[in-house]
Amino acid sequence: MKYLSKFFAFALLAAGASVIAHGQAQIPSQPQVKVDADKGITGFESFQGTVNSDSRIFKIDSNLGWDFNKHFGVFAGVPVYFANLPSTTTTTGATTAATGSTTNSGIGNVYLGFIVKAPSPKLDYAGAVTVSAPTGSTSKGFSTGRAGVDWTNRFERSFDRLTPFFEGGLSNTVPDSAFLTRPFTSLGAVSHLEEGAEYQLAKHFYAGGSGYQVVPFGSQKVFSKLDGKGKGKNPFDSAAVSTGNDLTRENGFNTWVAFEPASIWRLELGYTRSMTFDLSSFAFNLRMNVGKLLRSKRNY
């Protein structure tokens, strides 16, 4: 738990530093020559987590990239995972056994990719192809030991304050979403889908919901981030590595509220429910648009 406290302290300090830096940026009193906002450096820093009675999975994801224009860009990054199993107490008859808290931490797979965007008042589209290298530990469940490939597409359109969206993709591993940090890493062909909408409640405040599905094709191999020591009955709870055809099949839903006090950072808090794995979780995502901050400084 001491390590967990240090981890949270580091994440909060990093978030605070970015917010302070944004607050120190001076707004010019006179119009300036505008730098092309569609071209230049991009970068995101996110701290997200999923917490339930079975486990606590956290991820810090850092990436940098470059947009060549409003339609095409490239990026690269690396995630750092922190998986914690809380201590448990089991009573059998007159005997009580206690199991201490266990922790896994380390980097995941380094990734790079490109993004294609087609903004439009009628329908916004963005598609990304991401390739990852097996730099994470397979024994800790942070990698499958094989290269990963993901192709994701997102469509959305805003109707005043309401923004419906659809996201779908093909991959050889089940990806984390912006609101769900998974307790395992998988190897095997899957399709991943998410449909939902977000509504602006007031200035800076939003609420949203979505449903998601993961559909596997053929054999799946699952590497547990819990080292097979989870309290549940799912494959990633009971075994460090498991193989089967439907191990990654899943459907569920997310609900969230979001606070966006400035354009460079956003905090989401919510609830996620996996119907397939029978897991109800608290989830959060703190995201900082470092690239936008750097671009804004170039305008002054």
Show where each model-derived region lies.
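Outer-membrane beta-barrel biogenesis signature
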Residues: A21-D54, E156, L226, G244, ...
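Outer-envelope beta-barrel architecture signal
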Residues: S29-E45, K70-F72, P121-Y125, D160-F166, ...
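Detector for outer-membrane/organellar transmembrane beta-barrel domains
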Residues: G40, T144-S238
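Membrane-embedded beta-strand positions of outer-membrane beta-barrel proteins
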Residues: G43-E45, A76, F114, G127-V129, ...
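Transmembrane beta-strands of outer-membrane beta-barrel pores
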Residues: F47-V51, V78-N84, A118, V131-S137, ...
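Outer-membrane beta-barrel translocator domains and adjoining extracellular loop/strand segments
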Residues: S55-I60, P86-A94, G127, S137-G145, ...
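Residues that define the transmembrane beta-barrel architecture of outer-membrane proteins
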Residues: R56-I60, S101-V110, S143-V149, T185-L193, ...
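Outer membrane beta-barrel transmembrane domains
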Residues: S87-G100, H192, G196-Y300
